[in-house]
Each structure stands twice: as structure tokens, then as C-alpha cells.
UniProtKB/Swiss-Prot annotation:
Protein name: Thiazole synthase
Active site: 106 (schiff-base intermediate with dxp)
Gene3D superfamilies reported for this sequence: Aldolase class I
Function noted in UniProt: Catalyzes the rearrangement of 1-deoxy-D-xylulose 5-phosphate (DXP) to produce the thiazole phosphate moiety of thiamine. Sulfur is provided by the thiocarboxylate moiety of the carrier protein ThiS. In vitro, sulfur can be provided by H(2)S.
Amino acid sequence: MTTPSPSDALLIAGKRYRSRLLTGTGKFKDLDETRLATEAAAAEIVTVAIRRVNIGQDPNAPSLLDVLPPDRYTLLPNTAGCYSAEDAVRTCRLARELLDGHNLTKLEVLGDERTLYPDVVQTLKAAEQLVADGFEVMVYTSDDPILAKRLEEIGCVAVMPLAAPIGSGLGIQNKYNLLEIIENAKVPIIVDAGVGTASDAAIAMELGCDGVLMNTAIAGARDPILMASAMRKAIEAGREAFLAGRIPRKRYASASSPVDGVIG
């Protein structure tokens, strides 16, 4: 039996991770639920919205770092809520200052409040500036294969195409675009946004994605802790299925028991 080995680890910016499930820290009812869900997901990389979550900006308020310490988790500060390259770059620099020179960041520059689709022009502009400034950029983008390749060429360490609009729970809406991105990439491709349940995560991994990032699908579930556990198992199952190789789709039946050698 073949099982994923340590050499199958997710590699981002030179660091290896056992878990291919990345989780967010927003929308939970409190910090304790955030901690429990993160543990149930077995996530190693957790995203933090610098403009919304306290990681030291307010010394008088509870800090996320109290429940998700940086010596145990890789914190991935993100630019959620930014609508221009300038705001995104400024937010990343603030995060680097708060986290003592931490360069890994998740870039997202939104186009409008209704769809939360990425503004690809501003995203490209911000990515170029951040890479030049020494940041290791994981970038949220559309499922456009040409744009994904351009972001890779700029120097982003991971490209994160959406499966569907943020928080929609619609699942993967265009798997053929996603496949095109995966097949032409030389950096990790991590689905970001749109996952609604465990089967969505499994499908993303079966397609060959390197990982999945989610927040609402877990935090918005009736039982976030149980859903985090389900997502962990789905990611693992999807990855194993991808490595094992699915059978070809056929129009007609194919008997599982051969005719040759039938008794009688």
C-alpha cells in the first residue's frame, strides 16, 4: 500500500508543512472556538486579517497570539479589506513590524464589496511592490490561468485562485480553469474562497491542488469544530486519491470480474 510520505509535504517559501489545510481566524464566536477549530483541522498555517484581528495592535485587548502562538503556527497575515495596492502594501508592512520581520504574507486586493472578486490590476501592482520589498507573497486571485502564471512570474511563492466568491459556499465553479492553472504552475496552487463542505475540499485536492484555504466553511458551520475535523479528513482523502490516480471515465460498463476462466 502506498501512502503519502514525509517527502509529500507542502513546500511554501522553503518551509515544509505536513498539513495541506490552511484555515482562517475570522467569524468564530470567540478566541477559544478559534483555537479548538484550528486544532481540529490540524492546520499549521493560519491566516490573520491585520485590519480586523488583534495581534498586538491593541495591548489592552485579547490577542490572537494568546491562543495561536507563533512558535506553534505559521501566521499568515492577510490584506483582507484592502481595495487598492497602496492599502495592501501598507498593511503588509504593518504586519511585518508587528510580527518582528515576518515576511510571509497573503495578498488580496478586492474589486468591490458585493462580489469580493479580486481587482487584478491592483493585485499585480501590489504583488510587484511586495516582492521587490522582500515579502514572500501568497496571492489571492481569480481563476484566470494567464493571470495566475503572471503572478508566479512576478515571484509570488504561492498562487491562490478562488473556487467561487468568498463566503459563498458554492464549491468549485470552473474546475477546467483550475486544472489549467495547476498543470502550468511551478509554485503551489492553493484554492482560496468558495468551499462550502468537505466534498468541495476533496474535489480540489483530487484535481491536484496543493492545498485549500478556508474560513467561512468552518466558522459558519453549525458545529465548527466537527466541520474542521471533516475538512481535515477530506483534504487527506483528496490528496491520497490524487496520488493514487483515478480510473478513466468511460461511457459504458466494464465488468469488475473477467469473463476468462469462468467455471462451468
